[in-house]
Amino acid sequence: DPSRRDGVIGQSTLCLVFTSGTTGLPKAARITQARWLGVGEGWRGFLGLGPDDAFYCVLPLYHVAALMSLLSNAVAAGGRVILRRRFSASRFWRDVREHGITVAQYSGEMCRYLFNQPPTPDDRNHKLRVMTGSGLSPSIWQAFQDRFGIAQVIEGYGGTEINVGMMNIDNRIGSCGRIPFRDRSNARLVKYDRETDSYIRNPDGTLIECGP
């Protein structure tokens, strides 16, 4: 029913997502239609996602990880989403093979739990090519990709608690990523001194942009 979208614009509120409460009680962060759609379009573009992709989600959709970094991508790509109530290390790869999953999401130590499962002849018998998430330890990153044949692992940094999200889209292990689409954004990373808790500045007082 098109009338349900009457008056909806890019800055309209899509939903409220609560922060983790790192600096106090959880706070409601407003997610706009434009931000949600923009994230999906961005991921769709640089990952080459399309209607043939199948997305595997075991994380809660009320959390920014699944909502922003998986569901928006699937909608933008026109793909299908396979939902599980919870993560299961023993069932993960069976689901991936059974449903032809091509994109999956992880959080925290999920990849370590998968890596700690006994090796099987079917470890590479799947269509999964991309895993997105945060928290994959550099100590197992390369071994995890090699064992399961995952072509690309993308870590994201910055959910509801940061103004600029960064992504490691280069398969560079341990990198905190970079600002995506730099040529289309006015966001820049500048040098900061953690010891003095202050920005590092040029003699004229301007901020110093970080280099490669």
Describe the function of each predicted region.
Residues 27-30, 57-58, 80-86, 154:
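Short beta-strand->loop structural element characteristic of the AMP-binding/adenylate-forming
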Residues 11, 33-34, 59, 99, ...:
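Structural detector for helix-capping/boundary residues
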Residues 76, 93, 98-107, 115-199, ...:
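Gly/Ser/Thr-rich phosphate-binding loop
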Residues 204-212:
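AMP-binding/adenylate-forming core of the ANL superfamily
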Residues 2-18, 25, 48-54:
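Conserved pre-ATP/AMP-binding loop-to-beta segment of ANL
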Residues 13, 19-22, 55, 61, ...:
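Conserved S/T- and glycine-rich ATP-binding loop of Class I adenylate-forming
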Residues 14-38:
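Conserved AMP-binding A3 loop
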Residues 37-54, 62-102, 117:
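Conserved AMP-binding/adenylation subdomain of ANL enzymes
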